[in-house]
Every structure is written in structure tokens, then in C-alpha cells.
């Protein structure tokens, strides 16, 4: 694990390199393959409505309308904007003040914002990717959090999803689904929206696998959403008009077809050169071990070295090689503190459409070689 200060230095370094490339070569020399490339699709007529109170009134109504459609809500539900998904998670835990939070996800670890929020209200926190462990710990004093898709886009099994929700409902526990990427990627597996599965609350990120600004969209039962939103306003966690405008336009323009195309491209992406490189490097150092897997919209390199500390340092070094030499932006180097250090390549962005598979795989292979042969 990196310290907070080391995380800060990593982020500062990444931003400096991005700015240098932008100034020297222009925007076309950068390829955001993080899966969080986002966008800001507002219309010209939206600009006149960005005033604090006019914008809040107009765009909040639009976000509610299109957000409920996106997240599967009905007339008993409400949808509001926050300035990040993490902000919505914090506001939820501050408002509900649960005695304990039980978190089920497809693969450990969970997003750090959840445990950090629990510490603020002194809630006991437990996370597991074993459904049996989760079911045994749920009671009426529990806030049950379910992650639909991990930071590395591993998708929850639908039957386990339903089991946790049904058990929570039977024990009168509130169910909150962290569907940051899952609200969209789960659609590729024909999974229903979280609210249609019986969740009380769901949050999604408006920059993940869609062309919105970095923001959080919270939807669910009106009385719960109102309570959480009010708590969020006390700390300035709610989305302001410019952000709401970007979220509204992203929702209105959302098209699953781009994600479907990335899904098909990912299935056919040739990863054999990574396997070949792994064998070559292991002959030099038996501690080198490139662990990779396909994701629904690309692939992820989860490990390159057996020792955990060295592994994280090497993944970051590889990420910086990708950025400096090939203009490829990943969460590994540009992500917020606490984000996964796995090297994830996501093919859903417009930038991904500008480069072919050969460019990406060459960049990956050469960047790994550089990290281990320097």
C-alpha cells in the first residue's frame, strides 16, 4: 500500500506528464483508456441556465427524470446528483448512521470510500466476496451494501445478488447498491437494474462507461433519498448546476451500443503476446508473474510480481511508461488515492476508437519490458 503522500505524488506526476504531452503534442496524442474518460456534452442553450438557483431547479428535474430511467426507478423513487459517487456513499452513511455495514462484492477489496465513511460514524464494517459469510451477518441494524461490478469490472453473479437482497428484505435491512460501473456493464450480461431487483438505493458514477462528468447519481426510495440529499447539502456534497447539466446530457445521450462494441472488441483482443512476454521474463526472474484477465470491456493486468510491495511499484512504473511513451492514460497512475493499482485497459472511450489493438498491445509489452529491464 502507498501512503497518502505517495499517492499524492503519483497523481501530481501523472498530471504533469499529461499536461506536457497536451502542450507539446496536442489532445490527439493522449488516449484515455481508464474507463473514466467521461465527457461534458452540454448544449449551447444549457449555458444560460447555469445560475445557482435557476440551474438547480431546471437540471435537478431533468436528472431525476432521466436518472430514474437509467437506474430502473418508478414513481415511488427519486434521483439526485452528487459531486462524486464517493460523496453519495458518504452522505448515505452519514444520514442513515447504521450500527454496522455489511458489504458484498464479486471480488475483494471494496472501494475505500465505504470503509472510510463507516469510520466517521463508528459503524462496524465487514466486507466479503463469499455470499454465505454475508448472509449470516445481516440483521435489521445492518446497512447492506452490494457492489455490482468491481473497480476491475468483475461482475456480480445475479443469483447471489438476488440472495443478498432477499435476505436483507426478510430481515428489514436497507439495501444500497454501489453500481459505479455496474449500472451499465451489468446490462451486457442481461442483468436488471438494481432498483428492479429490490434494492432500496443505488448509486452510479456518471463518468464510468458513459460520457458524463465525474459525478454521482443516487436513486431509490423517495424518503431515503431526501434524507440523504439533505445530509449531503450540509457538507457541500451535492452536485451544482454545471455538473447537473453535464449529468443530464450524458443520461439523455447514453447509448449502450458503444459499450457493446467494446464488449465484442474485448472478446477478440489478442493477448497472446502478454503470455509470451511472461514466459520470457520468468526465465530471467522467477518472481516475475504477469497475471491478467479479460474484462467485459477490455483487459486488466492484476499482478506482475510475486512480492506485493514490488508488484505495486512495478505496476505504477509500467503505467508511467505507457503514459510517457504512448500517451495511454490508466487509473494506475491517474486515479484517485486508494484506487486500484491494477493496470486496466478499457475500450469504451472515444480515444479507444482512435487506436488499434496492435498499438495497445505493443505499448503494454514494451512498457512492461522497460520496467523489468531497466
Swiss-Prot record:
Molecular function (Gene Ontology), one example: L-seryl-tRNA(Sec) selenium transferase activity
Modified residues (N6-(pyridoxal phosphate)lysine): 208
InterPro entries, per the entry: PyrdxlP-dep_transferase_arc, PyrdxlP-dep_Trfase, PyrdxlP-dep_Trfase_major, SelA-like, UPF0425_MJ0158-like_C
Classification via Pfam families: SelA, UPF0425_C
Entry coiled-coil feature ranges: none
Cofactor: pyridoxal 5'-phosphate
Keywords, comma-separated and alphabetical: Pyridoxal phosphate
Protein family according to the UniProt entry: Belongs to the UPF0425 family.
Quaternary state and interactors: Homodimer.
Annotated protein name in UniProt: UPF0425 pyridoxal phosphate-dependent protein MJ0158
Organism: Methanocaldococcus jannaschii (strain ATCC 43067 / DSM 2661 / JAL-1 / JCM 10045 / NBRC 100440)
Lineage: Archaea, Methanobacteriati, Methanobacteriota, Methanomada group, Methanococci
